Amino acid sequence: MDRERPRKTREPASPGSVLSKRSKLSRKSLALRSLNKFHPYKAPSSVRSLKKAHTLVSNGDFFNGISLNCEFGKDFLREMDTPICTSKVICLPLDVHEIAPGRCLVLSPLGHACNMGFYCEKCTQSGQNSYSQFQGRGGNAKMAAQNSKDDLHSVTLTFYNQVSKVVQNKNFYLSLLSHSLTTIKKSFVQPSLLYSYTVLRALCDDVFPIFKDTENGLCMFALFKTDDLHVSETCLRHLVDNLIHYRVTLDCVKHTYMLKFSPIRAEANGMTIQEVEICEAITGLDFTDEIKQEIISGQELVSEL
């Protein structure tokens, strides 16, 4: 008769043993699998289903929440590291007051676009220095050295510093003189015209002004003698923020880009200037054939509007 062998009983593992640690990990893993309904040998869910699982609110609810809670919307924008839209196609004519702050304009025969300034290569290369692009003829380099870029922030200060500089603003004054001496005196009560011309000379390409007398006052057309035009965000901000008495429109006529400054109300100019001396200096300027031809061509172009 065979004797029954006594069964060996497994002694419980001590709390610090390796077996005890493994058993705890296995129980924890089993609990996690049962909680998440995840099996290590089953195929994982699709990426689309995972994305749906993480979508807690709909797009409509999300944007409604942002519109109702401004602070939440600001926090969301701070977390964004990529702009939603860096470029937008535009059509001419265009009112520059409709352009959002921080954007520049790039115009060419291939198309026109409104870009974010910090995404624009030309704005980045210039460093947004108000006088870094000061170029052209007629004493522009000297003008850049003499003036502070803070002058462009004020219509009154810019007009006061520029009105007596007849030689530097020769094209501006000779274009006025082509009408009459009375037209020059009318421009003295519209300081925003000289201010606009100064800003464009400083921040844009070669520009020539043409004037037209209207019921509300003198209207200025700034003609750009270039096929490709870039208007920086700094230039646009100066024009939009300071020309409260004018409507500024960008247009293209016969492949010529132009900015139209139309007065909508009278300006208040209480500055005292030496009108007689300035007018005498203007009449003494050299009216070259080149300038005459530019004035004639510009007036013919403006007459078609």
Swiss-Prot record:
InterPro entries noted in UniProt: Herpes_UL31
Modification note: Phosphorylated at serine residues in the N-terminus. This phosphorylation regulates the localization within the inner nuclear membrane.
Amino acid composition bias (Basic and acidic residues), ranges on this chain: 1-11
Family membership noted in the UniProt record: Belongs to the herpesviridae NEC1 protein family.
Quaternary data: Forms a heterohexameric complex with NEC2. Interacts with capsid vertex specific component 2/CVC2; this interaction directs the capsid to the host inner nuclear membrane to initiate budding.
Function: Plays an essential role in virion nuclear egress, the first step of virion release from infected cell. Within the host nucleus, NEC1 interacts with the newly formed capsid through the vertexes and directs it to the inner nuclear membrane by associating with NEC2. Induces the budding of the capsid at the inner nuclear membrane as well as its envelopment into the perinuclear space.
The protein, known as: Nuclear egress protein 1
Record organism: Equine herpesvirus 2 (strain 86/87) (EHV-2)
